[in-house]
Structures are given as structure tokens and as C-alpha cells.
Amino acid sequence: MEGTGAPVKTKRRYDSSRRRKQALRTRDAILAAARELFLGGGYAATTIASIAEAADVSVETIYKGFGGKPGLVRAISEKGLEGAGPIPAEQRSDEMRTLKRDPYTVMQRWGAFTTEVAPLAAPIALLLRTAAATDREVASLLDELDRARLARMEHNARELFERGDFRDGITLEYARDVLWTYSSPELYEMLVLRQGWPVERYGQFVAEGMIAALLPERREQPGHNLL
């Protein structure tokens, strides 16, 4: 019969889209439940069964999707690094670094990104640091995530280095290490979690520190404020 193909294809596309959305909702529910339980009760004490119960899914669903607790923590960490916006923070950082030629503005924005990402990612990294003392698999995951952050900081520094934005004598490796230090979960822990700094003040401190460590002194225009 003529005219019967299109409606079937449309229905299949609709069903497929609905399944994908449901799968994403399920994944988000699992990660939210796992994050809350890990941070509330600790890594070792949290079981897959308790996460499944909190997320209203089966244990098998979690093992199939994440492979166990290390996979869950990796996924939670990756989600945290995306930030809170609809576009992942790393993508926004890349786009901003390309569009903004002023390195001072770039680093101010990076400081702002830390206020968005650190509250999501740092507590999980600190949780792993504690668990790594007695769990080899967690220690390996922590090392993997830390090396990935170091590589990301080198990626961030490279374009500014190649454009000649840094002070004379600043190497790519030095710039990478400065960014790595200022993005560390330990710095967030010291200033925000322990000392009670507002996260906005912490982000400003990060931006000012990176600028002072890497960029030449800026001649300010009358009425101009760096941050």
C-alpha cells in the first residue's frame, strides 16, 4: 500500500528518541543517588545494592551501565567536570579561549569556571583520595583522573603559550603546572570546605593567582578593574 512508510519511520524515530531520553534520565538518577550515598557514607560503606534501591533500578542495571563502583565514580567525576550549564564546561572553555584574545579575560573566565566545576568535582576527588589508601582499584582511578586533569591543563595552556601571551621565560610545562595547581581539589578543600570561603571569592583568588603567576603586568586603563 502507498503512503504507509513515512508514519512507521516517524513512529520508530519517536520511540527511539523516547528510549534515549529515558535512558539518560535513568543514568542521571543512578549518578545522583550514587553521589549522595558516596559523599554521605563513604566509598567503602556504599554498596551497589543501596545505590540501586535509592535510584529505583536493579543492581544488574548498574553493573551493566557502569561495571561497578569505580565506573560509577568515574562517571560522577566526568559529569562534575561538565559543570552546571547545558554545554559542558570544557567545550565552553575551548570556545572562549579561541574567541577571547585577551589572556586576562581568559583567566578571569577560567576562575569563574572553577566556581562552577569545583563544587561538583572536588568532593568526589577527595572521596577517592581517602578510599585510595586501602583500595588499589580506587588508587589507580584517582591517578588516572589526576593525569587527565594535568593533560587538560596543558591543553588549556598551550594556545596561550603559542600566542606568546605568557611572560618571558614561562615555559609550557610551567604554565601547565600552575593551572594544574590552581584547579586542584586540595585548594578547593583548603579554602572553601575548611576555611569557609564563598565559592565566588575562591574563583577570584584562582583567577588572580593564575594571572600573577603567568601574565605580564598589565597597564590598567583609568577605571579598569582586573576582576
Per-range role (PLM):
Residues 48, 77-84:
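Short, basic, alpha-helical segments at the C-terminal edge of helix-turn-helix-like DNA-binding modules
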Residues 29, 33, 37-71, 75:
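Helix-turn-helix
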Residues 23, 31, 77, 107, ...:
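Amphipathic, non-transmembrane alpha-helical scaffold segments
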Residues 69-71, 75, 85-119, 176:
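Hydrophobic alpha-helical connector segments
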Residues 1-25, 218-227:
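N-terminal intrinsically disordered/low-complexity leader segments
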Residues 112-129, 136-163, 173-177, 208-212:
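Amphipathic alpha-helical packing segments from all-alpha helical-bundle domains
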Residues 139, 161-208, 217-227:
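Hydrophobic/aromatic-rich alpha-helical bundle segments in the mid-to-C-terminal region
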